[in-house]
C-alpha cells in the first residue's frame, strides 16, 4: 500500500478513536447512547486491524484476519498483552454478530479499557508508520 493511503487510513483510525472517546463521554443513560458507542467501537476496531495489517505487510508479514493481525502484532511487540487483544476482538465479534441487551451492557462496560488500549497502540504505531 502506498504511504499516502496508509497515512489516510491511520488518520481515519485516529478520528474514529476520537469519536469513540466522545461517545464514551455521553454516558449510558439511554440505550441509543450505548448502541452508538458500541457501533463506534466496532468501526474503530475495524480501522485498527486494517492499519496494523498494512504495517505488517510493510514488514513482509501477511495477515489476512483480525486474529492473525493481533497475533503477529503481539509477536513484534506492538501489542503488550495478546490475551487482552484477543478479548477485545471477541467483544467486537460478539457485538457485530448478535444483539442482546445484557451482552451489550457487559461489552459497553469494557469499551473504556478497549479505547485506552487502542489509543496506546495508536501512539506506539504512529512512531513506526
Pin down the residues of each PLM region.
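Solvent-exposed interaction patches of small proteins and small membrane subunits
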Residues: 1-129
Amino acid at each position: 500500500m502506498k504511504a499516502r493511503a496508509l497515512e489516510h487510513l491511520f488518520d481515519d483510525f485516529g478520528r474514529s478513536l476520537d469519536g469513540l472517546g466522545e461517545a464514551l463521554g455521553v454516558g449510558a443513560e439511554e440505550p441509543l447512547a450505548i448502541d452508538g458507542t458500541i457501533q463506534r467501537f466496532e468501526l474503530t476496531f475495524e480501522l485498527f486491524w486494517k492499519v496494523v495489517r498494512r504495517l505488517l505487510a510493510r514488514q513482509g508479514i501477511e495477515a489476512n484476519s483480525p486474529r492473525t493481525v493481533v497475533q503477529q502484532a503481539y509477536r513484534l511487540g506492538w501489542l503488550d498483552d495478546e490475551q487482552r487483544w484477543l478479548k477485545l476482538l471477541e467483544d467486537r465479534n460478539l457485538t457485530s454478530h448478535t444483539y442482546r441487551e445484557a451482552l451489550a451492557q457487559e461489552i459497553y462496560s469494557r469499551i473504556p479499557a478497549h479505547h485506552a488500549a487502542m489509543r496506546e497502540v495508536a501512539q506506539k504505531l504512529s512512531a513506526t508508520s
